[in-house]
Amino acid sequence: ADGYVKGKSGCKISCFLDNDLCNADCKYYGGKLNSWCIPDKSGYCWCPNKGWNSIKSETNTC
């Protein structure tokens, strides 16, 4: 049910803070190269070609 994306580095990232990383992780989790990870008002990330990711996100503390 969660729609969050986790950074490949192990850092947890927020869509609101870094859409580029969010998009990169969207690709990493199986989206197409041109797919975009879309943040919504609840802080969820939507990968158009993948669906909701299941890793909870927090503020990026890298």
UniProtKB/Swiss-Prot annotation:
Tissue expression remark: Expressed by the venom gland.
Function: Binds to sodium channels (Nav) and inhibits the inactivation of the activated channels, thereby blocking neuronal transmission. This toxin is active on insects.
Compartments, record wording: Secreted
GO molecular function: sodium channel inhibitor activity; toxin activity
Domain LCN-type CS-alpha/beta: from-to ranges: 1-62
GO CC term, one of those recorded: extracellular region
Name this polypeptide is given: Toxin BeI2
The organism of origin for this protein: Mesobuthus eupeus (Lesser Asian scorpion)
